[in-house]
């Protein structure tokens, strides 16, 4: 997992509420455990028509949105069934962060554990971002994870919440297992100093 510090990129707005994980990545793509190639399935039913041809009316197929790295999505993004393939598909497509007024909890957890930053903002900021994109699809914003702020084109900084442990992992590019392995020396020292009479689950 790559460390995340500051993300500066163009936004693309998908102002649809209750986008579920099946809309993000159809179930037929869940048969694979390899992350490569999942970008093809991202928003498949919207990006392609019945013949598999790109839908020119869908926002991600517009020439001016190519290369955007920050998705601005409607409330309750990622609802529905839990599927880790959803953040994998978003990352594979090139998105580094998703901004929304509210995320489904399971999706948010899956995304953060896979290095996809989820940024929850108030409704006013969300609407402003959508309007900015409608006016200029090349709009760029900056997300500073350390400061927990989104800086808009007018210079206004908007705070977003994130728990300290997740923030630490993202800043250092480690997942939960990586964090645990980094603390191996401290764990060994604790176990060595632990009184033998204390109950343990370790095998004798």
UniProtKB/Swiss-Prot annotation:
The stretch of residues making up the signal peptide is none
Show the disulfide pairing. Answer: none
Keyword tags = Amino-acid biosynthesis, Branched-chain amino acid biosynthesis, Leucine biosynthesis, Lyase
This enzyme catalyses:
(2R,3S)-3-isopropylmalate = (2S)-2-isopropylmalate
Q: Annotated Gene Ontology MF terms?
A: 3-isopropylmalate dehydratase activity
The EC number on file is 4.2.1.33
User: By its UniProt entry, which Gene3D superfamilies does this protein fall under?
Assistant: Aconitase, domain 4 (3.20.19.10)
Pathway, per UniProt? Amino-acid biosynthesis; L-leucine biosynthesis; L-leucine from 3-methyl-2-oxobutanoate: step 2/4
Q: Which GO terms describe its biological process?
A: L-leucine biosynthetic process
Recorded superkingdom: Bacteria
Q: Which positions, given as ranges, span the membrane?
A: none
The record's annotation in InterPro entries points to: 3-IsopropMal_deHydase_ssu (IPR004431), Aconitase/3IPM_dehydase_swvl (IPR015928), AconitaseA/IPMdHydase_ssu_swvl (IPR000573), IPMI_Swivel (IPR033940), LeuD (IPR050075)
Q: Which GO terms describe its cellular component?
A: 3-isopropylmalate dehydratase complex
Class in the EC hierarchy, top level = lyase
The record's subunit annotation is: Heterodimer of LeuC and LeuD.
Which PANTHER family does the entry mention? 3-ISOPROPYLMALATE DEHYDRATASE SMALL SUBUNIT, 3-ISOPROPYLMALATE DEHYDRATASE SMALL SUBUNIT 2-RELATED-RELATED
Concerning its family, UniProt says: Belongs to the LeuD family. LeuD type 1 subfamily.
- Describe its function: Catalyzes the isomerization between 2-isopropylmalate and 3-isopropylmalate, via the formation of 2-isopropylmaleate.
- Give the protein's recorded name: 3-isopropylmalate dehydratase small subunit
Q: Which organism is it from?
A: Roseiflexus sp. (strain RS-1)
């Amino acid at each position: 997992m790559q460390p995340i510090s500051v993300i500066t990129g163009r936004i693309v707005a998908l102002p649809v509420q209750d986008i579920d994980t099946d809309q993000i990545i159809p179930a037929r793509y869940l048969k694979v455990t390899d992350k490569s190639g999942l970008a093809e399935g991202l928003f498949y039913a919207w990006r392609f028509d019945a013949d598999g041809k790109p839908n020119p009316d869908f926002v991600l197929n517009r020439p001016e949105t190519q290369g955007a790295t920050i998705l601005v999505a409607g409330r309750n993004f990622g609802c529905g069934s839990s599927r880790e393939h959803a953040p994998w598909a978003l990352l594979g497509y090139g998105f580094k962060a998703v901004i929304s007024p509210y995320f489904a909890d399971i999706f948010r957890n899956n995304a953060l554990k896979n290095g996809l930053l989820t940024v929850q903002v108030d409704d006013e900021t969300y609407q402003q971002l959508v309007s900015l994109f409608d006016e200029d699809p090349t709009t760029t914003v900056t997300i500073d994870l350390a400061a927990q702020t989104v800086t808009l084109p007018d210079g206004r900084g908007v705070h977003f919440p994130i728990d300290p442990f997740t923030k630490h992992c993202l800043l250092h590019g480690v997942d939960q297992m990586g964090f645990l392995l980094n603390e191996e020396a401290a764990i060994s020292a604790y176990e060595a100093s632990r009184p033998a009479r204390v109950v343990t689950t370790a095998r004798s």
